């Protein structure tokens, strides 16, 4: 499998995990002037000669058997079209044109072909997920050989499938060209994330949402990273619903803007309680907290107990800041004051001692 961080060494498994596009049929890229109008004047005439020009005699001998029309056959539109297709589908020609020469006995049929350029190497542009070294090894173009458009097309599909398999659903080969030196240039667009834009958040600040994204701006869109990012935003506990929309990029139509739509709910709580016992008398409890303080994502809580015969005033105040740097380091503190009454009993169940335990202090958490 391809490693996105180390560059990987094997793109040949791109058809794994359902990526069947790596093995679909690839059409050869060539042009032809053949049409029914140009062939009709020769339909029915006897083919007295059959040749392929633009290649060596040895190559012609290898190619002639793939032609369906033979010497002695009558010219037909379908037959000429089929032979143009057969030659074009070899992948070695950029142009295939039938040429008729009238002779007393009938016509001589020649297929004039233009051979693709000889490649000297391959160059990749726009790739950041896979290294050029890995892609070059996968393409496996041997210098000095004629470019085969079918072979190249299959390799291009393999590259596209590898991107899709690894979650880069917007990445694909965008263009191919051969320069005057015979170098095959492969241009790849990877679907860069131009921006991450929160929407629907009336209280929560934008940065509280975007800092949870493991999918980063300026990096190729990856559906697995976006999925994890949405889960992290939802797990903040501030929202009833979190959805993602993909919008076209402003700088480049191949890029994408991620809009994350949220539906907020209340994050503050207030608890009031009261109780009575003979030992303690009437006690009251007040507790209030906020899990998204002023939309910053900070959390605070105040717990206060009042009343009782001893007029206890137990309280605890805590505050947590989940992000103090870009790495998600948290810092929290709590301050508490507590007094509890304890009673000891003997084996007969009689009270033998009564004492109070007081505690006061603070805690600091970091990490």
Region roles according to the model:
Residues 104-138, 181-192, 259-266:
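Signal peptide-directed extracytoplasmic domains
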Residues 18-53, 118-123, 142, 160, ...:
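Acidic, glycine-rich low-complexity/disordered segments
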Residues 60, 64-67, 77-85, 132, ...:
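Extracytoplasmic/secreted envelope proteins and their assembly/folding machinery
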Residues 2-108, 112-119, 123, 361:
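N-terminal, post-cleavage mature segments of outer-membrane
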Residues 131-133, 158-160, 172, 203-206, ...:
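Gram-negative/organellar outer-membrane beta-barrel architecture
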Residues 64-74, 147, 214-223, 304-308:
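Short, polar/charged loop or turn motifs at beta-strand boundaries
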Residues 43, 79-80, 99-107, 151-152, ...:
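Short, glycine-/polar-rich solvent-exposed loops and beta-turns at beta-strand/coil boundaries
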């Amino acid at each position: 499998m391809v490693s996105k961080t180390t560059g990987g060494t094997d793109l040949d498994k791109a058809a794994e995990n359902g990526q069947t596009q790596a093995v679909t049929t690839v059409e050869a890229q060539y042009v032809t002037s053949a049409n029914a109008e140009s062939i009709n004047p020769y339909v029915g005439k006897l083919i007295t000669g059959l040749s392929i020009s633009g290649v060596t005699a040895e190559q012609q001998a290898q190619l002639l058997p793939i032609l369906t029309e033979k010497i002695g056959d009558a010219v037909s539109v379908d037959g000429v079209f089929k032979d143009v297709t057969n030659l074009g589908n070899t992948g070695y020609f950029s142009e295939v044109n039938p040429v008729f020469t009238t002779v007393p006995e009938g016509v001589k049929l020649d297929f004039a072909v233009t051979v693709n350029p000889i490649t000297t190497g391959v160059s990749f542009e726009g790739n950041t997920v896979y290294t050029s070294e890995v892609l070059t090894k996968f393409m496996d173009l041997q210098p000095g050989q004629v470019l085969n458009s079918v072979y190249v097309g299959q390799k291009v599909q393999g590259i596209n499938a590898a991107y899709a398999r690894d979650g880069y659903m917007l990445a694909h080969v965008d263009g191919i060209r051969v320069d005057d030196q015979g170098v095959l240039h492969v241009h790849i667009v990877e679907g860069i994330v131009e921006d991450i834009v929160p929407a629907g958040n009336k209280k929560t600040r934008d940065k509280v949402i975007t800092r949870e994204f493991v999918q980063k701006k300026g990096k190729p869109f990856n559906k697995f990273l976006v999925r994890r990012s949405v889960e992290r935003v939802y797990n903040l506990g501030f929202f009833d619903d979190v959805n993602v929309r993909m919008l076209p990029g402003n700088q480049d139509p191949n890029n994408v803007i991620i809009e994350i739509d949220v539906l907020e709910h209340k994050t503050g709580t207030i608890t009031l309680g009261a109780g009575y016992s003979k030992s303690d008398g009437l006690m009251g409890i007040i507790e209030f907290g906020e899990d998204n303080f002023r939309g910053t994502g900070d959390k605070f809580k105040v717990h206060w107990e009042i009343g009782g015969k001893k007029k206890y005033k137990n309280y605890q105040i805590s505050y947590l800041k989940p992000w103090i740097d870009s790495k998600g380091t948290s810092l929290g503190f709590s301050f508490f004051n507590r007094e509890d009454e304890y009673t000891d009993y003997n084996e007969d169940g009689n009270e033998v001692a009564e004492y109070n335990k007081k505690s006061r202090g603070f805690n600091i958490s970091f990490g």
